[in-house]
Amino acid sequence: MAAEIIDGKAFAAKVRGQVTEHVTRLKEEHGITPGLAVVLVGEDPASQVYVRSKGKQTVEVGMNSYEHKLDADTSEADLLALIDQLNKDSEVHGILVQLPLPKHLDEDLVINSIAPEKDVDGFHISNVGLLGTGQKSMVPCTPLGCLMMLRDYHGSLSGLDAVVIGRSNIVGKPMAQLLLGDSCTVTIAHSRTKDLPEVVRRADIVVAAVGRPEMVPGDWIKEGATVIDVGINRIDAPEKGEGKTRLVGDVHYESAAARAGAITPVPGGVGPMTIACLLANTVTACCRANNLSEPEGLTA
């Protein structure tokens, strides 16, 4: 059987359309424009690309975009002072500090200085705790995007067996919490899990977020399972020419697609959903800040 391809680009466009509708409604009915502030420290090329893309998409959905670009040698005190200023700014509903930060800055300290209600990345320890106890929180963008795609494909996830491969604070752990919240039976697996192939073969849903190129072969996948591949790995591609590379996920796509019922490609699967969910979180944060009903379909 050939798996159905879950098109992340198309789904992200749908989410951005929903965000645009909510932003328009907030402007017309309440005179409120959601605002997202992105802080970039240093000149990391990949981070610069991400920040430009976030700013562009923020404006396209009708929100205000505030970019703060700081020198790589910016002191921790100056960065914390900027975040404090943004925390107090009523025009700013979401704050994102682009990671990684230069080594002299304490990432945990910086992230936890963001007001939890404006932490649209969902990394603040308060949001982590709220998610872990099943309470209303800001949810990390990548797991939220995965959950949206799974709900769209399956409808109800209740009772399904899910395996999350990877235990990071950014994807693995929050993904498991979200699946638990939707009444899945969840296993968190990782590189040291005993008999990992058999663990994965039992799963109706496989979320791979371990950061190892093509680690999961197709024969680990249960017939008809849904595969969400969060991995983005660049590997050599000599078939394209000397020095050429290509992007692959944590799952071997061709062999997995032959067995799965549905699968996300890399690229074009989970990746586009991350920024779309950042925009969704910003609208959610804006609604909460103004005691308005939250947008349906854009939250966990």
Curated annotation (Swiss-Prot):
Record: residues binding NADP(+): 166-168, 191, 232
GO CC, one annotated term: cytosol
GO biological process, one term: methionine biosynthetic process
Enzyme nomenclature, EC number: 1.5.1.5, 3.5.4.9
Keyword Hydrolase in annotation: yes
CDD domains the UniProt entry points to: NAD_bind_m-THF_DH_Cyclohyd (cd01080)
Coiled-coil spans in chain: none
Pathway noted in the entry: One-carbon metabolism; tetrahydrofolate interconversion
Catalytic function, reaction form: (6R)-5,10-methylene-5,6,7,8-tetrahydrofolate + NADP(+) = (6R)-5,10-methenyltetrahydrofolate + NADPH; (6R)-5,10-methenyltetrahydrofolate + H2O = (6R)-10-formyltetrahydrofolate + H(+)
Keywords in alphabetical order: Amino-acid biosynthesis, Histidine biosynthesis, Hydrolase, Methionine biosynthesis, Multifunctional enzyme, NADP, One-carbon metabolism, Oxidoreductase, Purine biosynthesis
A GO molecular-function descriptor: methylenetetrahydrofolate dehydrogenase (NADP+) activity
InterPro entries: Aminoacid_DH-like_N_sf, NAD(P)-bd_dom_sf, THF_DH/CycHdrlase, THF_DH/CycHdrlase_cat_dom, THF_DH/CycHdrlase_CS, THF_DH/CycHdrlase_NAD-bd_dom
Taxonomy, superkingdom: Bacteria
Subunit details: Homodimer.
Function: Catalyzes the oxidation of 5,10-methylenetetrahydrofolate to 5,10-methenyltetrahydrofolate and then the hydrolysis of 5,10-methenyltetrahydrofolate to 10-formyltetrahydrofolate.
Similarity comment: Belongs to the tetrahydrofolate dehydrogenase/cyclohydrolase family.
Protein name: Bifunctional protein FolD
Organism in which the protein naturally occurs: Ruegeria sp. (strain TM1040) (Silicibacter sp.)
Lineage summary: Bacteria, Pseudomonadati, Pseudomonadota, Alphaproteobacteria, Rhodobacterales
Gene encoding the protein: folD
